[in-house]
Amino acid sequence: IGSEIHLVKVDDPYYNESKNLPEVKKVMETLKSQILDDPTKTILIASTNRAQAGLIQDELDRLRNKDKVINDYISSHKGELDKLLVMNLETVQGEERDIVIISTVYGPDANGVVANRFGDLVRSGGERRLNVLLTRAKEKVYLVTSLNSGDIRVSPGAVTGKRYLKDYLSFAETGIISDTLVRESGEPENDFERAIMNAIKQRGYEVDAQIGCLNYRIDLAIKDPRDTSRY
């Protein structure tokens, strides 16, 4: 794994209508702590859905008007490559920062029940979008979550965003990495990789992009024609 992963559990979480306000507050605490630790680091805050990202942005705007630490940090990081960003699963592609704070959003409702519904993560391509989100950090990830990996129920053998989140949480909890994370493929990172990939395909080979484990990846891998489960 290329980046450090710090698991940050939310006290008294409450997930309701695609939002988790206690988790937003924990994200802000984590942000301020990181700024105090090293204000030179660039930071991205990302959530797994749009509604939570909007709530985080609103809370950040509110705190900026009353918290000197956060206001000074934002004021001193205004460049396109170092400004503080708040993004979601759909918009984070192409962005990178030293530190990424991730809000997983989902969690128990008012009755303490975690519904097995995970929005965009269960839709087609959810695992690829989540992989992009999880690999935006150059140095460190804070995984702010109201979930335990055991809260997420998946079908045996299924490779979906939900499975990917479960395995990532499990890795953060135990340090043990699953085959899902090791063998996950993604999309080419740039036009050069895409051109090379297309040229290889034109020669009759099957090829996957961004093979590997989170931040530790091989750009392109050609499948063995005699055994396509190997490269």
Spans of model-derived segments:
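Conserved helicase/translocase motor-coupling segment
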Residues: 1-61
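Short glycine-/polar-rich loops that comprise or flank the Walker A/P-loop
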Residues: 2-3, 82, 96-99, 137-141
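Generic beta-strand/beta-sheet core signal
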Residues: 8-10, 46-48, 87-89, 102-105, ...
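Short, glycine-/Ser/Thr-/acidic-enriched flexible segments
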Residues: 12-13, 50-52, 91, 106-108, ...
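Helicase C-terminal subdomain and adjacent C-terminal extension
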Residues: 60, 64, 111-214, 219-221
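Conserved motor-coupling elements within RecA-like helicase/translocase cores
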Residues: 69-100
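A short beta-strand element within the Helicase C-terminal
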Residues: 95-107, 112-115, 141-142
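Active-site beta-strand-loop-beta-strand hairpin of nuclease catalytic cores
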Residues: 221-231
